[in-house]
Each structure stands twice: as structure tokens, then as C-alpha cells.
Amino acid sequence: MASNDLETKHLETLDRDLGRFSSLEKATSYVAKPLVAPALALIFIIIVGILAATTLSGVSNTIIIVIAAVLGAYMALNIGANDVANNMGPAVGANALTMAGAILIAAIFESAGALIAGGDVVSTIAKGIIAPTSMQSVDEFIWAMMAALLSAALWINLATWVGAPVSTTHSIVGGVMGAGIAAAGFSAVNWMTMSKIAASWVISPVLGGDIAALVLW
């Protein structure tokens, strides 16, 4: 009888210890899980910076190029977290695509679109919104564009954190315009180009809604 009581106590103690271990494991998982994504993002940014530094070692303005690469990597992460989610959200929500399929399609076609047809958009962002000649020096223009890239990335990061879908285009165009005004005044901005861009922001959702309505007619 005493042996049975002792065995029962041992089992109860073992159950309590296993329960504590299970609770500790759950708590560790709960704390660590939110840190995985930021850690992977940081690793990606560091790798991009290292690759840029090693590839361009010995080139003039290497530091500026490395900083630009790091900011570009940070911006790319934010585009994936917010802008790509905007595009793929309806398809995933309608169960037309799985999350893995949506990510794969986004990775392929976002990259292909930028490489095949992104030149004109890059030119507009780089030279069409603010005139490089309005700056006192090339370095001033470079740092203005850096500031625009960083400000847009920070804003998209904040919007992603609060779960707000925002436009990368709006963010970077606003960043470039603001940086140009801060560096060289309102005269630095090409207001005709800005008017066309702003008009497209109004036309795009209306046109998209009309086309969607026609498809479902």
C-alpha cells in the first residue's frame, strides 16, 4: 500500500514537471515566433550590404552605393510585406491561390516586371519629379534620393505594422517630392509630371472598379 502511494506521488510529481515544461515550451514559442520575421529581414539586409560592399570594392563612392543597396533591401522587404500583399490578398481570400502559390507568383512576376518594363517608371522617379539640375551638387541630389527612399520605406513599415494597406508608388513619389522641396525649394519639383501622376492615382481605382464590374456583369 505504501509502495502504491509512493508511486502515485512520483507520477503526480512527474505530471507537474511535464506540465511546467509544456508551459515553458509554449511561452518560449510565443515569445520567439514574432522575432523570426524581423531576424530574417535583418539577415537579408546584412547579406545585401555585404554583397554590395564586396562586389563594388575599389569603386568610387562605394559607401554611398552600399547605403543605397541596404536601403533598397529594406524597401524591398516592405514592398513584399505590404504592396504585394495588396495585390495577392483578393486571390488568396477567394481561395483561388494558396499563400505559398501567391508568394511564388509575386516573386517571379514582380521581378520580371521590374526587369522587363520598369525602366520608364524608374526614369520618372529618378528624373521626372525633381530635376537633378535644381540641386547645388550631384551629392546633394544623391542624398535627397536616399532620404526619399528611407522615408518611403519607414512609412510603409509603419503602415504594415498597423495592418494598413498603402501604395508604394504614393509613398516613394511623396518622398521624392518632399526631399526635393527640402533640398532645393518648391521650384525643384516638376509640377506637370506630379499632376499627371496624381491624376493617375484618381483614375486607376475608378478604372479598376469599372473593369471588375464588367468582368462580373
What kind of feature is each model-predicted range?
Residues A2-W217:
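Alpha-helical transmembrane segments and immediately membrane-proximal extracytoplasmic
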